[in-house]
């Protein structure tokens, strides 16, 4: 069992502590599924106001469900469909204030109100997966979350391939 000292007082401190902890976790394991699982658990445990966090792995032209924390989720998402599929197809971060107004949104959990999806790139800049964070609070994610989660996923991407 791991024990971490993570300060959740401010987003800046939270993301700094998460980054340090994630680097420690990843340095101990080479398996990509184990690393995604621990990353999802770390974020789920310390980031407030989330109702789902997890990974979709890029396999051909689909995103296939990977390790996650939260309710049962959609298993297969085509590139270009919904927030996750759009992030994978465009290679761009999707920060959605209100998922109910997002075109082509896939609703796996009707209680989700906002969503942040970040593509995870490997060493050759290929998209390996996306991380999907969902919140029941509209407008939950801001520029600090985008920056902080992006740094976490840059580190994870180096360990995934």
From Swiss-Prot:
Gene3D superfamilies: 3.30.450.40. GO terms for cellular component: cytosol. Pfam families: GAF_2. GO terms for molecular function: L-methionine-(R)-S-oxide reductase activity. Disulfide bonds: none annotated. Belongs to the free Met sulfoxide reductase family. PANTHER family: FREE METHIONINE-R-SULFOXIDE REDUCTASE, GAF/PUTATIVE CYTOSKELETAL PROTEIN. This is Protein ZMO0507. It comes from Zymomonas mobilis subsp. mobilis (strain ATCC 31821 / ZM4 / CP4).
